[in-house]
Amino acid sequence: MFINRWLFSTNHKDIGTLYMIFGAWAGMVGTGLSILIRAELGQPGSLLGDDQIYNVVVTAHAFVMIFFMVMPIMIGGFGNWLVPLMIGAPDMAFPRMNNMSFWLLPPSFLLLLASSMVEAGAGTGWTVYPPLAGNLAHAGASVDLTIFSLHLAGVSSILGAINFITTIINMKPPAITQYQTPLFVWSVMITAVLLLLSLPVLAAGITMLLTDRNLNTTFFDPAGGGDPILYQHLFWFFGHPEVYILILPGFGMISHIVTYYSGKKEPFGYMGMVWAMMSIGFLGFIVWAHHMFTVGMDVDTRAYFTSATMIIAIPTGVKVFSWLATLHGGNIKWSPAMLWALGFIFLFTIGGLTGIVLSNSSLDIVLHDTYYVVAHFHYVLSMGAVFAIMGGFVHWFPLFTGYTLNDTWAKIHFTIMFVGVNMTFFPQHFLGLAGMPRRYSDYPDAYTTWNTISSMGSFISLTAVILMVYMIWEALASKRLVKSVPLTTTNLEWMHGCPPPFHTFEEPVFIKSPQL
């Protein structure tokens, strides 16, 4: 029965598929919003109206991409599909809670869209800083709807995190230890811990903002003894772990893809990779104020946050060089998924280097709120998280559907996307160094050339997105069945065929040797 299978689902594979479809749909919305932004900035002068509507679009673009595209696909889609298969569990620990985690997202998305349709919309930026987000600068229901939307998405993520942690710790067969689980499983577990620890702080912050707006409290209002800087601390204590939440599952996927297409049976430096991810997770919690170098902190505070931020580069470097070492001496297969993984390693590293630049508090004073920051985080998200998602998608597509994508189209798609995102975001480094500020719908003529090039790049990326939709349709219409999958002994998820049966691992797996 359709309703029983898709609305009341308790099957990790079906819920994973729902997350994938929802994330893809939200991704289209987010892409549309980003095209609006680049159309507005394609030449000087106004296109859409005033800066309020522009900032509503920017804010919605960020929220949609983060909470309704990257997280649902990476954690909800790939996590649900792969974690139980990789550890040999029959399903997730709490299958009905899993269903609830998913179904909290569509209403959350609805609230976010509603926020932009009432009053003037929430033009606050994704950070929702007061006093701009207060009830004077943003009278009306828009910001309140946005806050409720975040609450729902947050509850969804917390429930999902509890589910993943329980599943990964308790549902492995007795024979395998935590240090024999695949790296993607590790990455999801660490991500879940980060979610569990950071989201309640965001919930507290936005709830205080809600009461400031509606119940006359003054948590963030100096007139009543409050402090808007407190909100920034609460927000970024969530916001910084959040960016690692967005990338960590990608690290896990890239490890699998690189290992698989290098023909290796395990990644280079498995334990180093695990420790690196745990270090990144831990350090992610103690660097939040590097987003606040411009609020007037003590020099010793700035010194600490600068050095702590730079330390994160070390475990990140361990990961990058371990991926390169995994490639070394391998029998490399230049499949589309491998191209995405190699693109990820290269572009994520560039994004990491600009991150090191921004971690210097003195430099950040100059570069804060310029397009240099936009370029930095889009290199790690738009070419890190998204490339990992695309690589994981083309790699596991045969597992999810039982059909194969057209290899040539997939490679063309990668090439167009690669050119598009680089043409969009590389020029933004120059704009930022030249002092162009973020979150403005217009700019002095001096910035025209790079903005025009950047906007052209965004339309190239749009072409790639449309091509991807065609590619998926072509694969599902042609129904080319998967012949055989190599290397199944070291990649448990493929063991049951493509696609795997509705129920897998109904009894614990038997492990012959201590090594997985």
UniProtKB/Swiss-Prot annotation:
Name under which the protein is recorded: Cytochrome c oxidase subunit 1
Where is it localised? Answer: Mitochondrion inner membrane
Query: Which segments sit on the Mitochondrial intermembrane face?
Result: 41-50, 118-140, 213-227, 287-298, 358-370, 434-446
Q: Any idea which positions bind Fe(II)-heme a?
A: 61, 378
A GO cellular component entry from the record: mitochondrial inner membrane
Locate the residues binding Na(+): 40, 45, 441
Which Pfam family is one of this chain's hits? COX1
Question: What's a single GO MF annotation on this record?
Answer: cytochrome-c oxidase activity
Quaternary state and interactors = Component of the cytochrome c oxidase (complex IV, CIV), a multisubunit enzyme composed of 14 subunits. The complex is composed of a catalytic core of 3 subunits MT-CO1, MT-CO2 and MT-CO3, encoded in the mitochondrial DNA, and 11 supernumerary subunits COX4I, COX5A, COX5B, COX6A, COX6B, COX6C, COX7A, COX7B, COX7C, COX8 and NDUFA4, which are encoded in the nuclear genome.
- The positions annotated for binding heme a3 are 376
Q: Which family does it belong to?
A: Belongs to the heme-copper respiratory oxidase family.
Record-level GO BP terms: electron transport coupled proton transport; mitochondrial electron transport, cytochrome c to oxygen
Q: Where is this cross-link: 1'-histidyl-3'-tyrosine (His-Tyr)?
A: 240-244
Question: In which residues is Mg(2+) bound?
Answer: 368-369
Q: Which keywords does this Swiss-Prot/TrEMBL entry list?
A: Calcium, Copper, Electron transport, Heme, Iron, Magnesium, Membrane, Metal-binding, Mitochondrion, Mitochondrion inner membrane, Respiratory chain, Sodium, Translocase, Transmembrane, Transmembrane helix, Transport
